[in-house]
């Protein structure tokens, strides 16, 4: 081979090698940083898809007494319309667990539990099996009692805190009812989320008969907030106010508006961090039924739930 041909051949080989090296260094199209990694790696055939669940907390005023004369027909139709997957109830007066289950069956819930069958009990109804973990009654100083249950892999705590301004049996001065509620909430927290800190999914709801610092923008100066501050320090988030800057009242309704009570929020759904990040909607339900059949408005949330217990 002639000398100039050899030189030309070597030059072409060097140029081709440079092109090959450049091609190796260039990113592939599939590695475009604008495309999220999960879109590249997720297998639609095996990925876990969440279900959407709805939960309502409702104080039904002494066993839904305003609809008892109609055999609870209006209440049943309302629940069917809202279609919660499970529902916490305060003031299930005069219900037994058997009769509450029968009522729940009418609106599509096959399961129900009641904390007791006297006084002002709390209850829980569900489309899905309820694992009752504890009835909080005489073993802790709770005025109305509480329920700790599990639905799917979600811990659900239903409570109704002490309703009066002074200690039971007239003990103590005005305002000491706050101290009793503080005692109740600490007993409930000690028996539930503090006792099982490694369990990530918690909802705690009910009539707290007390005020949250989250509502300080709508409350008078000097309002007592410690009951809810204790809850917030225990790993719970306010499902309503942590998603909305606006104040919403849960009392009074039209039923008792003439009493002259100022708008207040005493009905809450609290969520642990693992639950809070999956909530897609939270609201107080204002409609014709809720305005006229109880002295409290119900609270509702919707959330994503991963069957694997994500």
PLM feature spans:
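Active site of divalent-metal-dependent phosphoester/diester hydrolases
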Residues: 110-124, 210-278, 285-291
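N-terminal, active-site-proximal structural segment of metallo-dependent hydrolase catalytic domains
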Residues: 2, 25-103, 307-310
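Acidic/histidine-rich helix-loop elements
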Residues: 57-73, 162-180
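Short helix-loop capping/hinge motifs at secondary-structure junctions, enriched
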Residues: 129-134, 275-279, 308-309
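Bacterial N-terminal signal peptides that target proteins for export
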Residues: 2-17
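Active-site beta-strand termini and strand-to-loop segments that position acidic
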Residues: 125-127, 148-153, 272-273, 294, ...
């Amino acid at each position: 081979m002639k000398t100039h041909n050899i030189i030309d051949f070597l030059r072409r080989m060097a140029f081709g090698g440079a092109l090959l090296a450049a091609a190796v260094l260039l990113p592939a199209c599939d590695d475009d940083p604008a495309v999220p990694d999960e879109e590249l790696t997720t297998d639609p055939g095996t990925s876990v898809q969440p279900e959407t669940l709805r939960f309502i907390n409702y104080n039904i005023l002494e066993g839904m007494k305003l609809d008892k004369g109609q055999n609870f027909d209006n209440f049943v139709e309302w629940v069917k319309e809202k279609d919660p997957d499970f529902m916490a109830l305060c003031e299930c007066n005069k219900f037994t667990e058997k009769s509450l289950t029968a009522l729940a069956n009418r609106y599509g819930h096959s399961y129900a539990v009641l904390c007791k069958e006297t006084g002002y009990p709390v209850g829980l109804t569900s489309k899905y099996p309820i694992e009752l973990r504890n009835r909080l009654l005489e073993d802790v100083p709770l005025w109305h009692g509480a329920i700790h249950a599990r639905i799917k892999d979600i811990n659900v705590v239903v409570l109704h805190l002490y309703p009066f301004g002074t200690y039971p049996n007239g003990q103590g001065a005005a305002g000491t009812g706050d101290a009793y509620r503080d005692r109740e909430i600490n007993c409930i927290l000690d028996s539930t989320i503090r006792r099982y800190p490694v369990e990530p999914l918690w909802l705690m709801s009910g009539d707290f008969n007390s005020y949250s610092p989250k509502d300080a923008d709508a409350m008078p100066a000097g309002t007592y907030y410690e009951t809810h501050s204790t809850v917030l320090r225990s790993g719970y988030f306010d499902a309503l106010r942590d998603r909305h800057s606006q104040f919403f009242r849960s009392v009074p309704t039209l039923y008792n508006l003439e009493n002259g009570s100022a708008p207040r929020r005493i009905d809450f759904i609290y969520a642990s961090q693992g639950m809070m990040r999956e909530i897609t909607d939270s609201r107080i339900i204002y409609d014709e039924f809720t305005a006229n059949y109880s002295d409290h408005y119900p609270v509702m949330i919707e959330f994503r739930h991963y069957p694997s217990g994500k």
